[in-house]
Amino acid sequence: MIIIVTGTPGVGKTIASKKLSEALNLNYLSLSQFVIENKLYTEYDELRQSYIIDEDKVKEELEKIISTSHLVIETIYPSLVSTADLVVVLRKNPFSLYNELKGRGWADIKVAENVEAEILGVISQEAREAFKDKVCEVDTTEMSTEQILNKILNKQCDGPIEWLVDTKVQRFLEELDKIISSYENDI
């Protein structure tokens, strides 16, 4: 059994994935840690304080593990995983997510890009394109880890979630675009 838990940074992937793996007695794999530990990246992006992954190498190495394991895989890149029985996309209200990421001390550009990705549903769309009806979206806003875990275990999906129906979110997206645009010379 392969379960992918995905979503933008700050939505609760790590703790939910670990709890899910414990509840189902499956191994846990953080794809980010896997990439770093196995040097499956091409460079380090100083501006975003992130590694640029080598997608081909990641897919190749991941395939070796998937073929012999039962896993909960935590990742922001669901399409790098070749197969899954369930794909859980954790979502979070963009305003709440912004506060979460700012609280981590992240650079403004990194916060803005990740919140923009959440608003636009980038990871959700990627998951749906790769895994179609195996996707379950869960809104983690103001939920405890236990509540999130129960929703996943009971496949109580909230999605598809569309943040852009809210005019406040639309205006927020415009502000995020301004932040991102201010970094254009650095990108």
Curated annotation (Swiss-Prot):
What Pfam families would the database entry show?
A: AAA_18
Which example biological process does GO assign this protein? ribosomal small subunit biogenesis
GO MF annotations for this entry? adenylate kinase activity; ATP binding; ATP hydrolysis activity
Chain spans, region LID: 103-113
Q: What is its EC number?
A: 2.7.4.3
* Residue segments, region NMP: 30-53
* Substrates-to-products reaction catalysed: AMP + ATP = 2 ADP; ATP + H2O = ADP + phosphate + H(+)
List ligand-binding residues for ATP.
G10, G12, K13, T14, I15, R104
Alphabetically ordered keywords of this record: ATP-binding, Kinase, Nucleotide-binding, Ribosome biogenesis, rRNA processing, Transferase
Q: Does the keyword Isomerase apply?
A: no
Name of the top EC class for this enzyme:
transferase
Q: How does it assemble?
A: Interacts with uS11. Not a structural component of 40S pre-ribosomes, but transiently interacts with them by binding to uS11.
- Function field: Broad-specificity nucleoside monophosphate (NMP) kinase that catalyzes the reversible transfer of the terminal phosphate group between nucleoside triphosphates and monophosphates. Also has ATPase activity. Involved in the late maturation steps of the 30S ribosomal particles, specifically 16S rRNA maturation. While NMP activity is not required for ribosome maturation, ATPase activity is. Associates transiently with small ribosomal subunit protein uS11. ATP hydrolysis breaks the interaction with uS11.
Cited PANTHER family? ADENYLATE KINASE ISOENZYME 6, POS9-ACTIVATING FACTOR FAP7-RELATED
Which protein family is it in?
Belongs to the adenylate kinase family. AK6 subfamily.
The protein's name in its UniProt record: Putative adenylate kinase
